Amino acid sequence: MSKLHDKLIGTVPSRIVEQASIALTSYEGRITEFNVASWLQVQGHAGLSVSLVVKYRDGQQQREAAVDHGRTDAVGKILLSGIARLPVKHRIEDLQVHLRPTTAVTAITIDELFVHPVEPVAADRKTAQA
C-alpha cells in the first residue's frame, strides 16, 4: 500500500503518550505498546483494503508501525484494532494514527478513535495465577 494516500485520523495527546511504560526486550530493544482502535467509514469505497498505521517521532527519526489491516464492508465501514509495538531509542513525540488505503480516498468519517497505553502486567499477578 502506498504511503501517498495516508489520511490522518488523529493525533494522540502527549499526556497519553507520557503514561506509557517502556519495556526492554531481547530482540527489539526498548519498546512501548499502545492499544489502538478506530471505527471508520470510507464513503463510496466498499471492499477497499486499508491499514491502520501509527506514526511517531523518536528523537530525530520518523518511524511507523502497522496496527491492523482489513477490507471495508458493503457501505464502506470498518473496525480496525490492535496493539502498536513501538521501538523507541529516545522519546516518543508527535504520535499520530493514520489510515492507509490502497487507493486515494476523498473523505473518511471517524466514528471513534481509541488510543491507550498497554498496562504492564504486575509480577505478583503472574505468580497468583500460576
Regions found by a protein language model. Give the residues of each.
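Extracellular and organelle-lumenal recognition/adhesion modules and their flexible linkers in secreted
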Residues: M1-A130
